[in-house]
Amino acid sequence: MTETMLLDPVQVLVASNQPLQVGSAALFEGDRLIALGEDARERAAEQGVAGQNRAHQLLAPCLVDPHSSLPNPFTGGGETLETLINAAGRAGYGQLALLPNSESERDSPERLKGFQPRDCDLKVHLWGSFSYRGEGERLSSHADLLEAGAIGLSAGQQIPSASLIDRALLLGEMAGAPVLIAP
């Protein structure tokens, strides 16, 4: 059976453009937030769930790091994918996106595999490489990368030539995906 828990009162930040809700309530079923505020209180009362006072705690959306760099994700002498995920989770991040510049430039669909750890609440997204091997000379297969799960394409630290960018736009394989190009 799934555990139901009511945090009441608790401080709730729904979004950055909304004020902090002091004295609000949050209802959870298992690991899912199912209701906030009066709706949470009403649902909890229907189920006979008592509130737990968390007035000094803050419930807020997880942070997102849209462009993490991890040169050696699996064999790094410093940070690895595992240590990055652990540190990000402790710091309040719920999602991160890895740039493609690594020991194996993510310029083909098969290089997008193995990055989502099991038994982990943190979601790992991957940027695909804009060019083959990240060298800025030949385009990678944008459509294949996006179909394989890349959230967008990144040119890395270099600025691709105008002709390469023009060719990518003419091919139209990027659809509506975001493209990161260094300033």
Sequence positions of predicted segments:
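Residue-level marker for buried hydrophobic side chains located in beta-strands
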Residues: 5, 62-64, 179-181
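Short glycine/proline-enriched coil/turn segments at helix->beta-strand junctions
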Residues: 30, 46-50, 120-122
